[in-house]
Each structure stands twice: as C-alpha cells, then as structure tokens.
C-alpha cells in the first residue's frame, strides 16, 4: 500500500498530474543534493521521500499562470 495515500496527497495538490511532476522534480533534487526535509522517512527511495514531504506540507509549489491557447 502506498504511504502516504493518494487521497491524502490529493488534498495537498489539486491534480494527480501536478503531484507527479512536483514529486519527480523534488526527487531529482534529492538525488543530487541528498537533502531530505523529513527527519525519519518511511521510504528509502527519493520519490517516496518527496511524496512524504508533500504530505507533511514541507514542500509546496506555485501554480503557473500560463494558459494554453488554441
């Protein structure tokens, strides 16, 4: 089972696609710098640690104002 749950994560970030993008970018940062904000993470992988940071609200994002025009 995924910990933290997808339902819990989607209360923090509005879209599952945005959630994946934010978590992936943070995981790449952690791979390079190894600077996890969570003191005792449950996961040992960077993506899991990034999701834990999002769930703890230690990580946030600012939505872009750009709109796609056709």
UniProtKB/Swiss-Prot annotation:
InterPro entries: DNA-dir_RNA_pol_omega (IPR003716), Pol_omega/Rpo6/RPB6 (IPR006110), RPB6/omega-like_sf (IPR036161). It comes from the Bacteria. SUPFAM superfamilies: RPB6/omega subunit-like (SSF63562). It catalyses: RNA(n) + a ribonucleoside 5'-triphosphate = RNA(n+1) + diphosphate. GO terms for biological process: DNA-templated transcription. Its EC number is 2.7.7.6. One of its GO terms (molecular function) is DNA-directed RNA polymerase activity. One of its GO terms (cellular component) is DNA-directed RNA polymerase complex. Keywords: DNA-directed RNA polymerase, Nucleotidyltransferase, Transcription, Transferase. It is an enzyme of class 2 (transferase). Promotes RNA polymerase assembly. Latches the N- and C-terminal regions of the beta' subunit thereby facilitating its interaction with the beta and alpha subunits. The RNAP catalytic core consists of 2 alpha, 1 beta, 1 beta' and 1 omega subunit. When a sigma factor is associated with the core the holoenzyme is formed, which can initiate transcription. Belongs to the RNA polymerase subunit omega family. This is DNA-directed RNA polymerase subunit omega. The gene is rpoZ.
